Amino acid sequence: MGVIDLITRVDSICKKYEKYDINRQRDANVSGDDAFSRLYSAVEYALETVLQKTEDLSSETNKAKAVAMNAEIRRTKARLLEGIPKLQRLSLKKVKGLSKEELDARNDLVLSLRDKIEAIPESSAPVVGGWEASTSYSNIRFDTNVSDDRIGSEYFQPTGESDQFKQEYEMKRIKQARLDYIAEGLDTLKNMAQDINEELDRQEPLMDEIDTKIDKAATDLKSTNVRLKDTVTKLRSSRNFCIDIILLCILLGIAAFIYNSVK
């Protein structure tokens, strides 16, 4: 196979699968209002961050820190899975500048992203310094005749370092729980804001139509008032003319009466 044939084959393969490139879809978006691309990028970035944390967790030697990291990974994984249904709804929304094939490919992108999120490992880091089985010390024997006075309640009394470690761990746990609560609240507010924005976008054509109808009604009412004013003016003029005729007839009658009396 020659170089030209190889380049042609690579170009055909790239063209076949370019509809699955979310970055190209974002660049090709003309309207600039693609909520799917924004949410997909955010979830993808969070997924990369979680995967990096899982790699750090595998090499973590501090047991308390490893437990905290593992809990954070589980919470983030659950949060990412909660965003998948919204991504699926947004993938069905038509976007100006994208073809039908690219819109159909978005569902495949969401399914692939969900599989990656579900594949995130949740195992904690290995415990360092714990009890491990070893065949090199199979000859070690434990003496069961140790006096109870040597292993009493004082042997298990907490030290200053252990109390300090416990306090620090409890403070970090409480602080992390509060931060998680705040983060969940912010996520909820963010989702509400996005939903409100989408609803406003859907209601905007209706508001424009209502404004148009109001303007038309105001124009019709103004023209009706003008016609009504003209009609009232005409009626008033006709009434004044009739009154003038009646008064003239009365005056003529009085003049005729006086003339007949004098004659």
Swiss-Prot record:
The modification Phosphoserine is found at residue 12. InterPro entries: Syntaxin/epimorphin_CS, T_SNARE_dom. The lineage of its organism: Eukaryota, Viridiplantae, Streptophyta, Embryophyta, Tracheophyta. One of its GO terms (biological process) is intracellular protein transport. Keywords: Coiled coil, Membrane, Phosphoprotein, Protein transport, Transmembrane, Transmembrane helix, Transport. It is found in: Membrane. It comes from Arabidopsis thaliana. This is Syntaxin-73. The chain crosses the membrane at residues 241-261. Belongs to the syntaxin family. Part of the t-SNARE complex. The keyword Transmembrane helix applies. It holds the Pfam family SNARE. Residues 262-263 are vesicular. Expressed in root, leaf, stem, flower and silique. Residues 1-240 are cytoplasmic. Residues 169-231 form the t-SNARE coiled-coil homology domain. GO terms for molecular function: SNAP receptor activity. It comes from the Eukaryota. The keyword Lipoprotein does not apply.
